[in-house]
Amino acid sequence: MSEKNLLTALSKMITEQRNPNSMNIDQLSALELVKVINQEDKQVPLAVEKCLAQIAQAVEKIVQAFQNGGRLVYIGAGTSGRLGVLDASECPPTYGVPPEIVVGIIAGGERALRHPIEGAEDNTERGKADLQAVNFSQKDVLVGIAASGRTPYVIGALEYAKSLGATTVSIASNPNSAMAQIAEIAIDTVVGPEVLTGSSRMKSGTAQKLVLNMLTTASMVMIGKCYSNLMVDVQASNEKLKARAIKIVMEATECDRTVAENTLKIAENNAKLAIMMILSDSDKTTAEQLLSKHHGKLRQALVN
């Protein structure tokens, strides 16, 4: 796209408009300034609320993918890419899943997590190539993230995923974007102009983070990665998480600390297995068999 055409396109985007509520921010005190930002941030959850039907639809597709051996893959550039990588990286310790189940890809690679990479987002072929590098397939779900809804890198990835017959989801902060025209499911969190004109790391980025939280949390809950609202598949990889695992077992079973610690030791720090052992009054092998029979869903295993 020529510079003139790009300027015209940007001028039409809500995310590039000037916010009338922040025209004088360079004249405000610190307290007045953060009040303006806070007031604008209040619009974010309301914008996300309008997209709940589309978010739920995406969750159902992600659950289907997980159940059929597929993955959830996020792709984006800049802030959008970083948020995808962040959400993906939280899944293994929180839900005990392998890191390849939820994948975050950012334009420019790992260096782009900390440093801007010139022109990384402008290449549609690079988006396709980065998906090919992780062996993206029809079984996977691709979530393309870009506040503008027009990032070439993300568009290239969405087009490639669509050509394979994979489920495609777009997350943007401008309605009827180019990405939305490609994606099977379009999540348009229209949060309005930013406090700092064009700085989509602010409200748009916050909206993206809320949506990503929902996508992974709801999907993991639906495949049995929690019991009630407890993270029973948490990986006890440090002292804080080991203490949390003990607390989870105690709360789920109403046992005392000694029972929780002893059972966790037998269960090799597997909180879900320890809970199954205590509530079903079974040994480790039997508890493992019961959980396996019910695909790791603790509540179903206990009922049956």
Curated annotation (Swiss-Prot):
Gene Ontology process terms (BP): 1,6-anhydro-N-acetyl-beta-muramic acid catabolic process; amino sugar catabolic process; N-acetylmuramic acid catabolic process; peptidoglycan turnover
A Pfam family recorded for this sequence: GKRP_SIS_N
Entry keyword set: Carbohydrate metabolism, Lyase
Misc: A lyase-type mechanism (elimination/hydration) is suggested for the cleavage of the lactyl ether bond of MurNAc 6-phosphate, with the formation of an alpha,beta-unsaturated aldehyde intermediate with (E)-stereochemistry, followed by the syn addition of water to give product.
KW Zinc-finger (keyword) present: no
Domain SIS: 62-225
GO MF terms held by the record: carbohydrate derivative binding; carbon-oxygen lyase activity; ether hydrolase activity
Gene3D superfamilies: 1.10.8.1080, Glucose-6-phosphate isomerase like protein, domain 1 (3.40.50.10490)
UniProt feature coiled coil, ranges: none
HAMAP family: MurQ
UniProt name for this protein: N-acetylmuramic acid 6-phosphate etherase
Name of the top EC class for this enzyme: lyase
E.C. number(s) listed in UniProt: 4.2.1.126
InterPro entries: Etherase_MurQ, Glucokinase_regulatory_CS, MURQ/GCKR, SIS_dom, SIS_dom_sf
Species annotation: Actinobacillus pleuropneumoniae serotype 5b (strain L20)
Active site: E90 (proton donor), E121
Function: Specifically catalyzes the cleavage of the D-lactyl ether substituent of MurNAc 6-phosphate, producing GlcNAc 6-phosphate and D-lactate. Together with AnmK, is also required for the utilization of anhydro-N-acetylmuramic acid (anhMurNAc) either imported from the medium or derived from its own cell wall murein, and thus plays a role in cell wall recycling.
Catalytic activity: N-acetyl-D-muramate 6-phosphate + H2O = N-acetyl-D-glucosamine 6-phosphate + (R)-lactate
This protein's record includes keyword S-adenosyl-L-methionine: no
Subunit structure: Homodimer.
Family: Belongs to the GCKR-like family. MurNAc-6-P etherase subfamily.
Pathway annotation: Amino-sugar metabolism; 1,6-anhydro-N-acetylmuramate degradation; Amino-sugar metabolism; N-acetylmuramate degradation; Cell wall biogenesis; peptidoglycan recycling
